[in-house]
Amino acid sequence: MCGRTSCHLPRDALTRACAYLDRQGRRQLPQWRDPDKYCPSYNKSPQSSSPVLLSRLHFEKDADSSDRIIFPMRWGLVPSWFKESDPSKLQFNTSNCRSDTIMEKQSFKAPLGKGRRCVVLADGFYEWQRCQGTNQRQPYFIYFPQSKTEKSGENSGSDSLNNKEEVWDNWRLLTMAGIFDCWEPPKGERLYSYSIITVDSCRGLSDIHSRMPAILDGEEAVSKWLDFGEVSTQEALKLIHPIDNITFHPVSPVVNNSRNNTPECLAPADLLVKKEPKASGSSQRMMQWLATKSPKKEVPDSPKKDASGLPQWSSQFLQKSPLPTKRGASSSLLDRWLKQEKEDEPVAKRPNS
């Protein structure tokens, strides 16, 4: 399943990260609808608003179905036929939609038949693994493997954000297949909401959870899913399957509380700092070896922090993906990415300042 995500990029940066080629092969930036409803966050939960990609044809009859817009929608689909005046009175959970029952439940079958397909945007999503023999659960942050060029991140200023010809070479957003619908209350404005489609977990995630989002890996998959004018429902559903091209790392339990919205939510955590080394044997030797390979911790429950106030980590904390990935590059990029966020944050908003 998928019950928590991160999508913290500023609006302009998110726009650039979603640049695409139109049907004529021209690079385009998606236009926004209701941009003021977008609230960046490291810790998004159901019933909050999240940005989704969808075809412009849903709103403009003369538009090309390959043209895209970004639209912040409520997470948790409210069916168009819902009769109550308050969406919170919906008696069933629609934050996720199982791929194997998508054509059996009217809440999802009806909007899917109308071509209401969308792509949910996120830095990545969180999942919790139940620790054996305890009631505790360890959170993980799951995302696309990241590559990093030498120029990456150097052109993230406002000038480059307005240049649609400049290729985005920073964090690769996770693109998840979704279904949306439009509900009209007795009074008030229309409510657009979505559900994330889920599939069986891939081999690399099966130890964490049995389900995962249906991830659209690559521009072709995203384009086909969105283009309901040219791609039929039957063809689009062929894109819904587990993928192995993901990586993940453990994170702090601070993410457990959805009210916590800081970079610490997705920063890699060292699980070993919570374990006491044994007095003798291989475990002690392993702990001694790790102590020579990684910086000492200030306190037992948290990673050491550098001058920027953010936790330090190394690629040893990134978990294995079934396919070869550049884990060092992913960790290094995430490190620099979070440090840049800290540097760009207004001084007045920083804690203890």
From Swiss-Prot:
Which residue windows does the record flag with biased composition (Basic and acidic residues)? Answer: 295-307, 336-353
Q: Where is this motif: PIP-box?
A: 332-338
Q: Its Enzyme Commission number?
A: 4.-.-.-, 3.4.-.-
A molecular function GO annotation: protein-DNA covalent cross-linking activity
Q: Where is this site: Required to stabilize abasic sites?
A: 209
UniProt PTM comment: Ubiquitinated; the covalent HMCES DNA-protein cross-link is ubiquitinated, leading to its degradation by the proteasome.
One Pfam family, please name it.
SRAP
The cross-link Glycyl lysine isopeptide (Lys-Gly) (interchain with G-Cter in SUMO2) sits at 148, 151, 274-275, 305, 339, 342
Q: Where is this site: Required for sensing abasic sites?
A: 127
Annotated segments matching region Disordered = 292-353
Where primarily located? Answer: nucleus
Q: Which InterPro entries match?
A: SRAP, SRAP-like
Task: Report the record's Gene Ontology biological process terms.
Answer: DNA damage response; double-strand break repair via alternative nonhomologous end joining; interstrand cross-link repair; positive regulation of isotype switching; protein-DNA covalent cross-linking repair; proteolysis; somatic hypermutation of immunoglobulin genes
**Would you name any one GO CC term?**
replication fork
The answer to whether UniProt assigns keyword DNA damage to this entry is yes
Entry-annotated residues carrying Phosphoserine? 160, 294, 321
Q: Which residues form the active site?
A: 2 (nucleophile), 127
Q: According to the UniProt entry, which residues carry Thiazolidine linkage to a ring-opened DNA abasic site?
A: 2
Supply the alphabetized keyword list: Autocatalytic cleavage, Chromosome, Covalent protein-DNA linkage, DNA damage, DNA-binding, Hydrolase, Isopeptide bond, Lyase, Phosphoprotein, Protease, Ubl conjugation
Where does this polypeptide localize?
Chromosome
Instruction: Kindly give the PANTHER family that the UniProt entry links to this protein.
Output: ABASIC SITE PROCESSING PROTEIN HMCES, DC12-RELATED
Query: Which purpose does this protein serve, as stated in its record?
Result: Sensor of abasic sites in single-stranded DNA (ssDNA) required to preserve genome integrity by promoting error-free repair of abasic sites. Acts as an enzyme that recognizes and binds abasic sites in ssDNA at replication forks and chemically modifies the lesion by forming a covalent cross-link with DNA: forms a stable thiazolidine linkage between a ring-opened abasic site and the alpha-amino and sulfhydryl substituents of its N-terminal catalytic cysteine residue.
How is this protein named in the record? Answer: Abasic site processing protein HMCES
Which organism encodes this protein? Rattus norvegicus (Rat)
Gene name of the encoded protein? Hmces
